[in-house]
């Protein structure tokens, strides 16, 4: 069990920022501090993508250091930053012989629910109202997995709000409340102000946006530097093919 002190995330991150630079990034001696930082991320509702992915890559390179509880925490934390690609990246850094363990499979199934924006199913799982089936044979375990991750449900609500902002023009208040897990009127108003929604018909309907009038073209340009490619090549295991 990884031990940490409350409020330790900032100190750990500051130390790790120095320790995981350059060729020292995947030094096995960093494992303990990385695991402590991941535990602090969960309890203090903080997140650092570099630390999360570095920990997973270090486990790949040093299988004897592998800790499933830390991997589970990282996967759950990456779900709190959806619709970002961190969850997909994290899955790619877990070896095939480990990723199908019962607990990790539960997290992956939960991730599938959220990636498909199936908020109705998520809230049933979170509230213990989901009937067991082939996908979730022990649905009560999902709520137990989420409990140690501070702010998990709030992160899902923010994710849902972002999806609503990009897919709806208007939405009935009752439907909005369901998508957000049954929040009260005060919380609905809070999200409406944060995301710029306008209450209409005495609050029965929320105007989200006229997407037809706000369409903008966007070019996505990503550049890979030589140092990026070099680091990947250096840390990629070489496989010998025998024909």
Which residue stretches match the model-derived regions?
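Charged, E/D/K/R/S-rich low-complexity terminal regions of large eukaryotic assembly subunits
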Residues: 1-47, 61-73, 77-243
